[in-house]
Amino acid sequence: MGKVVGIDLGTTNSCVAVMEGGKPTVIANAEGFRTTPSVVAYTKNQDQLVGQIAKRQAVMNPENTFYSSKRFVGRRVDEVNDESKEVSYGVEKAGSNVKIKCPILDKQFSPEEVSAQVLRKLSDDAGKYLGETVTQAVITVPAYFNDSQRQATKDAGKIAGLEVLRIINEPTAAALAYGLDKKSNERILVFDLGGGTFDVSVLEVGDGVFEVLSTSGDTHLGGDDFDRVIVDHLASTFKGNEGIDLRQDKQALQRLTEAAEKAKIELSNATQSEINLPFITATPEGPKHLDLTLTRGKFEELASNLIDRCRVPVEQALKDAKLSTGEIDEIVMVGGSTRMPAVKELVKRVTTKDPNQTVNPDEVVAVGAAIQGGVLAGEVKDILLLDVTPLSLGVETLGGVMTKMISRNTTVPTKKAETYSTAVDGQTNVEIHVLQGEREMASDNKSLGTFRLDGIPPAPRGVPQIEVTFDIDANGILSVNAKDKGSGKEQSISITGASTLSDNEVDKMVKDAEMNASADKEKREKIDIKNQAETLVYQAEKQIGELGDKVDEAAKAKVEEKRIKLKEATEKDDYESMKTLVEELQQELYSLGASVYQQANDASQAAADSNTDSKVDGDDVIDADFTETK
């Protein structure tokens, strides 16, 4: 079994780690950074960019730069109305699913495909570090992700060419990293406020056992929302002064978003931030500039509703765990957004404890995922992880009511069966509507899909016995089976109508990704060989000039001949000729260098021989007179 990497696939940034020598190690990306922006872009040349390089060009290419795609993964269009209005790229409807529009390629991507490109970069960079191809991973998701979102994350891994061995909840991963070496039992509360989601989990950890007691959260709350209140403030202020709504201009919106994120980060350490955006727009009178000072107090006032929303999941998680704040030993803060002073203050106020800040909030989740990868690979022993399902699961029954089969915070994996019957006389089929959520009415909960069981023998209502079985695996992913006890007819779901991709769609995306990866690799190789050729042409020209008459003309002529041919090949983009000529010119330069040293050695030897011949014989005596002067 090869190395299993742990990947924190974040809304804003992602991170990858691996177990080395029994210890988790965070792997730096190809650019040398320990976290990678979860951003994918396509340029006017149709080149794909991922990570920091994609983020840097976002202002100039807002419609083809895709960020925060995690907020769309596994969701239907009607679930992301607000989020789709806040991004600079187009979000479209395809059936009930979300598609991301890419004008430069004239095509649509599923959010899973965008996430897959981020995963591919992380796994490729990890492979370069490890010196082997990475094919297996543990990927983290917010604890409050529903079944569709978990399956969609697994699909993204598959599209990226990864076998996803386990989907693990982010707070649980953080607890693994925090509690790996803890021997005594502790009850900890993990407060995880990331770029797009918010989770709270209460766990009991100690001596290798990690038991999740409860989890709660909000998948529509994260750092992006804090950025948005700053964007709205800047845009409203500018509109009040200039009468122009910058949110209608995609390029201006992207600049506002980047400025808002920068200001938010600065205000975690400073009491005010200067926001200066020259030439943000123009009117017939000339260019307009945005120049504004945002204080920490004003930011906290703007974000007060968001900060208050963090309180409820904390209280709910404690209530579900049947614990008081006094029974919690440590508060572990996870996610970059927990650096905000107002968030720290809220946690301290609600829990009456100072947060533990010994873990790196940007890396701890990936570290925990790597530990879980080590457990699955057999590298890490004596770890028992007991996680829970975040939301109740059930079916719709007569009257549009949701009947719960598995309650939230049930330890997974788990399996439960219930027997139901028909609603009318002579009914020969039943439709099973699978739901996830906490509301009483089916219409108020998340629909995971429907399926039909046919072939039920006609009988009076209430007589047939239909056994419905819910089975949740260790990834928190649900499968449902329905069986008529009378006829033995059975139907397992493939949940239809859910926002996850079909197997055929995933397989097609896997093939597309492989083809693109191959094309990208070929394109990269061409760029590398051309860069190498141009560098070598320059080095050869410089070397000949510096050596001058120190080498014979014949040797210089050979180098010059190859140099000219290679230069012509680069100008024509003749890559095959470049490959051959690079090697040939390199050899000629080696020979030229060797001849220089040979000539220098010959000259040194000649000088040594000359000195030997001119030495004075030691037996000769020379007489001399001297006079003493007083």
From Swiss-Prot:
Q: What is the induction comment?
A: By stress conditions e.g. heat shock.
| Protein name in the entry | Chaperone protein DnaK
Q: Which keywords accompany this UniProt record? A: ATP-binding, Chaperone, Nucleotide-binding, Phosphoprotein, Stress response
Its Gene Ontology molecular function terms?
Answer: ATP binding; ATP-dependent protein folding chaperone; unfolded protein binding
What Pfam family is a match, any one? Answer: HSP70
Q: Which stretches of sequence are listed as region Disordered?
A: 601-630
Q: Which residues carry this modification: Phosphothreonine?
A: T197
Matching entries from HAMAP family are given as: DnaK
Q: What is the lineage of its organism?
A: Bacteria, Bacillati, Cyanobacteriota, Cyanophyceae, Synechococcales
- Protein origin, superkingdom: Bacteria
The family database entries (InterPro entries) matched by this protein are listed as: ATPase_NBD, Chaperone_DnaK, Heat_shock_70_CS, HSP70_C_sf, HSP70_peptide-bd_sf, Hsp_70_fam
UniProt biased composition (Low complexity): 601-611
